[in-house]
């Protein structure tokens, strides 16, 4: 009788271990798939996630790029959108015309690519925010940016 009891306990432990191993394996596969999509610049804290792959040439410093974007605060509040205005936004990449997080986050994008940029305050609007505007001091910003054109 004791042998059957111990055998039952061992069987339950083995089944639970196999279940947990299989679940962990699925999570590892999912993380491996996402690894190519999400990156973080260690020195700046910028996080990027590719939402849609692009094609063609990559945007480089000195290029004039045209994008559509929507900006959010961490709580999900939308504060700006070129899509809502129906007018794309163009700027010279890497020249400081935009916040540093944009210069870093848009660099390397391909035409047609859509990225999520998570920009810490240090490379966003910092401790000043946008006085009288929608971005509070020390805000982490989230942008969805689609690269439309490189000139």
PLM ranges: what are they?
Residues 1-151:
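Cross-family detector of peptidyl-prolyl cis-trans isomerase
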